[in-house]
């Protein structure tokens, strides 16, 4: 009993504020910690389901039609806060050599030094900097795209598809991302004139991910 009383006395002495200013500092620190803890508690981390996700693009050919393509190998870290209804983290990695336009000869050319130079720049990455919420299901992902050794800002339109549970009871999230960029910003295909291949590239991404 004496030992217990001593411990309580020690703790009381240790954490008892010595002044009103110190008391306020402790209160502010505690409030910040509580807010941070609540934020982490509400956010969920998801791992991407590649079988039900896609990273696609479209680019105009000869100024009259669009060629579609995609990257077959990719991964992402996704953190979504259901209470705040906003994306907290999005970091994606794409294997450059996995580019696929349904034409092997063209794909080999895209992997070459004329375009992506996949042997030297084997990864394409996208990292979210901030999320601008527009509604409970829509917003803008402001981030940076690193490709071909060049990093540029790219904004993607976010649209939440919704939530469900898989057969094992794990929660799944689905959302779409759309945006555009310019290949010449990343020094890709600089010798290819725009009359042959447009500078603008449309980005179309579909994500289905499972809670970890």
Give names to the regions the model predicted:
Residues 1-2, 40:
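Intrinsically disordered, low-complexity Ser/Thr/Pro-rich tracts
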Residues 32-35, 114:
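Generic secondary-structure transition motif, activating predominantly at the C-termini of alpha-helices
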Residues 25-33:
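Sec-dependent signal peptide recognition
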Residues 3-23:
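Short, Lys/Arg-enriched N-terminal segments with co-localized hydrophobic residues
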Residues 43-212:
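Low-complexity, acidic/polar, glycine-enriched regions of mature
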Residues 34-42:
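Hydrophobic h-region of N-terminal signal peptides that target proteins for export
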